[in-house]
Swiss-Prot record:
Any one GO BP annotation for this protein: DNA replication
Coiled-coil region(s): none
Key words of the record: Covalent protein-DNA linkage, DNA replication, Early protein, Endonuclease, Hydrolase, Nuclease, Viral DNA replication
Protein name according to UniProt: Replication gene A protein
The protein's Enzyme Commission number: 3.1.-.-
Keyword Hydrolase: yes
Entry annotation: catalytic residues: Y450 (o-(5'-phospho-dna)-tyrosine intermediate), Y454 (o-(5'-phospho-dna)-tyrosine intermediate)
Gene Ontology molecular function terms on file: endonuclease activity
Principal EC category: hydrolase
Protein's organism: Escherichia phage P2 (Bacteriophage P2)
InterPro entries xref list: Replication_gene_A-like (IPR008766)
Spans traversing the lipid bilayer: none
Gene of this entry: A
Length: 761
């Protein structure tokens, strides 16, 4: 019998909250597995598109090509060919390739300046991936073509004016310089004295110095290496290899390159001495370098002492401090950060793609707006002084931290001027008011501690244990190497004083004997500056120099310089620091602080005492006074084959042994093999029937290349314009006959045994 419900139902059971874990069953084999299915193959159009992108990648320099091909192979192997296709078409072709193209366009040959090197355009485009050997050959081709151009222009000028003497005028040299230097500008360089040439102020002496550089292979090598390094780094910035997630501040390649160059420089310094030109006294060069501000520890201590002195001087004058931060617009930043706190992620900034600015461009922008600010300060009779620190963002874009002091009544006006110029360009973009300019008031006594972290971070990471970097989240102590590599790569000075007396005079005053007054030689004002520098009190030094914002000509003490007796390889006088002088007492009243003339020379190799190595033999007499050494750690140095042969010859001369003994023959044969120069493959004789003799190298040595410049000047003074092969022959020691007059120049014989004396008519 059915039971009728009276309108009441049992409610369902409560819903069980999920645990968040997928049901796996009672046993491990009950866990769900991936669905079995075939991966979608690439279509014919996709394959064709993928091959085109891979062909584009294959034309990139190796350091970029290997980066993308390895990433593509990893995705294709661990995911699927479809995912690899999406990486090539979406990530590379759509997002990265336009940035790479824009960087290459900014660095390509400037054909608007000259079409002389149009044939080298493709070769110049390979500069970021060029090795040193190929780069040196490229530099030699550039200098030789410019030399040929100069010769042709000189001949044309003589034909037009009729006399060779007309070449040695300002007008002629300016004409030649304009064509040669204009052609060199195709390689994105600024030749020396180019601005003076554009203003019509070029002299013969200046033209010669500038043109001599353009003919120098080593000068071009140095220029091209700098361009290669910056081009290489900009490409890595463009593809996102320089940021807090990859390598902050500088790429891994730049850090390794700077470390290798510094290690090579250190090894060179260890291999050299400082020699007194008069007495021949020698001291270790590396010890002097490590005792100067080249030592990061000493540099940091000097900067901290400078900051403390500035703060004490400001407190004595009643000035107030400001901590200013200046940042470039967003278009100078290759990346941007999205999110907050630990969830921040780095994304490419597509606003950067239009211009592809590098850190050097951002530094120029900051210097430009700072010059506008200083002009506004001068127009409104405002004065500031302090210290500027330049450091990079995580993506390599520089920003400035400035510790400035001023009169309390001028502070608001100064801040408003700086804010106006900081936001003058793209000031309406999102976040500009908050990020582009920041000004904080400094409490008395807190300035040094506030900026000390930035100084240590940019030098050696001293006393930063346990502190994290705001940009990268990494320990500040570990970022110092990357920051210094960034500054070295982009040639950006990290520290600069503002409105303060010169640091050069401060360092020269500290070279004077401690506690020895110079008031009798100068006056009490100069003595006060010396005493302040001697005690390391930078605040008193500022006061003794006349205070902050005093023009250099009005300062109490300045650095004295004089031309050196020697000229450089471009026949230019080189000024060197010799001491100090007081402008108010006359520029000729100089106190010499550098009384000794030193030069850098290689270390003298340590010659071990001659020891003839032999076994213990039977004594010639009943008493053997030359027993075998026993005990101790003393070890006799092994003689070279030449030293061993010399000792054997002495024994032969004394009649102890005979010429025909086997030991003598072996010793002399070993010495001959040891002293024989090993020829390289190009110098070996290919004929098996002829003896293998060493031929001198056909390349010019460094001393011969330097001699060519001096020979050209000497012959030009005699009205002679030699050809290139004649200059090379004269540099090698040949005698050349010009119209019955013989010319020859001394040269070091770097290939003994081969005559370098020739005569050409």
């Amino acid at each position: 019998m059915a039971v009728k419900a009276s309108g009441r139902f049992v409610p369902p059971s409560a819903f069980a909250a999920g645990t968040g874990k997928m049901f796996t069953g009672a046993y491990a084999w009950n866990a769900p597995r991936e669905a079995v299915g075939r991966e979608r193959p690439l279509t014919r159009d996709e394959m064709r598109q993928m091959q085109g992108v891979l062909s584009t990648i294959n034309r990139l320099p190796y350091f970029l090509r290997s980066l993308f091909t390895s990433r593509y192979d990893y995705i294709r192997r661990n995911k699927s060919p479809v995912h690899g296709f999406y990486f090539l078409t979406s990530t590379f072709q759509r997002r990265l390739w336009p940035r790479i193209e824009r960087v290459n366009q900014r660095h390509e040959m400037n054909t608007d300046a000259s079409l002389l090197f149009l044939a080298e355009r493709d070769h110049y485009a390979r500069l970021p991936g060029m090795n040193d050997k190929e780069l040196k050959k490229f530099a030699a081709r550039i200098s030789s073509q410019l030399f040929m151009m100069y010769e042709e222009l000189s001949d044309a000028w003589v034909d037009a004016h009729g006399e060779k003497e007309s070449l040695f005028t300002d007008e002629a040299q300016a004409h030649l310089y304009g064509h040669v230097a204009g052609a060199a500008r195709a390689f994105n360089i600024s030749p020396l004295y180019w601005k003076k040439y554009r203003k019509g102020q070029m002299t013969t002496r200046q033209a010669y110095s500038a043109i001599a550089r353009l003919f120098n292979d080593e000068w071009w090598t140095h220029q091209l290496k700098g361009q290669r390094m910056r081009w290489h780094e900009t490409l890595l910035i463009a593809v996102g290899e320089v940021n807090k997630d990859r390598s902050p501040y500088a790429s891994k390649h730049a850090i390794r390159d700077v470390r290798a160059r510094r290690q090579a420089n250190l090894e060179f310094l260890k291999s050299c001495d400082l020699e007194n030109r008069e007495t021949g006294e020698r001291i270790d060069l590396i010890s002097k370098v490590m005792g100067s501000i080249s030592n990061p520890e000493i540099r940091r201590m000097e900067l901290m002492n400078t900051i403390a002195g500035i703060e004490r001087y400001a407190a004595a004058e009643g000035d107030v401090g400001m901590f200013i931060t200046l940042t470039a617009p967003s278009k100078y930043h290759p990346t941007r950060q999205v999110g907050k706190g630990e969830s921040k992620t780095v994304q490419l900034n597509h606003g950067w793609n239009d211009e592809a600015f590098n850190p050097k461009d951002a530094q120029r922008y900051l210097c430009h707006i700072w010059s506008l600010m200083r002009t506004a300060f001068k127009d409104n009779d405002l004065q500031v002084y302090g210290l500027r620190v330049v450091e990079p963002h995580h993506d390599g874009t520089p920003h400035w931290h400035m510790m400035l002091f001023c009169n309390p009544r001028q502070r608001n006006q100064i801040i408003e001027i700086m804010r106006r110029y900081a936001l003058k360009e793209d000031g309406d973009e999102r976040g500009a008011a908050r990020n582009r300019f920041q000004a904080k008031h400094l409490n008395q006594g807190g300035a040094a501690g506030y900026i000390a972290k930035y100084i240590s971070k940019n030098i050696d990471g001293y006393a930063l244990d346990g502190q994290l970097d705001n940009d990268t989240g990494r320990p500040l102590k570990d970022t110092a190497a990357a920051v210094t590599a960034w500054a070295s790569t982009w040639r950006i000075p990290q520290f600069k004083t503002v409105g303060l007396p010169t640091m050069g005079a401060y360092r020269e005053l500290r070279k004077l004997p401690r506690g020895v007054s110079i008031a009798d030689e100068f006056d009490e004002r100069v003595e006060a500056a010396r005493a302040a520098a001697d005690s390391g009190d930078f605040a008193l030094y500022i006061s003794a120099q006349g205070g902050a914002n005093v023009p250099r000509d009005c300062q109490t003490v300045r650095v004295a310089r004089s031309p050196s007796d020697e000229v450089n390889e471009y026949e230019e006088e080189v000024e060197r620091v010799v001491g100090i002088y007081a402008p108010h007492l006359g520029a000729r009243h100089i106190h010499i602080t550098r009384t000794t003339d030193w030069r850098i020379v290689p270390k003298v190799p340590v010659v071990e005492p001659l020891t003839l190595k032999s076994g213990i033999a039977a004594p010639r007499s009943p008493v053997n006074n030359c027993g075998k050494l026993t005990g101790g750690d003393t070890s006799l140095p092994a003689p070279t084959p030449s030293e061993h042969a010399a000792a054997v010859l002495n024994l032969v001369d004394d009649g102890v042994i005979e010429w025909n003994e086997p030991e003598v023959v072996r010793a002399l044969r070993g010495a001959l093999k040891y002293d024989m120069r090993t020829p390289n493959r190009q110098q070996r004789n290919g004929s098996p029937l002829k003896p293998h003799e060493i031929a001198p190298s056909a390349r010019l040595t460094r001393s011969e290349r330097l001699q060519i410049t001096r020979i050209r000047v000497d012959l030009a003074q005699n009205g002679i314009r030699p050809q290139r092969w004649e200059l090379e022959a004269l540099a090698r020691g040949a005698t050349v006959n010009y119209d019955g007059k013989k010319f020859t120049y001394p040269v070091a014989d770097e290939w003994p045994g081969f005559s370098t004396v020739m005569e050409w008519t």
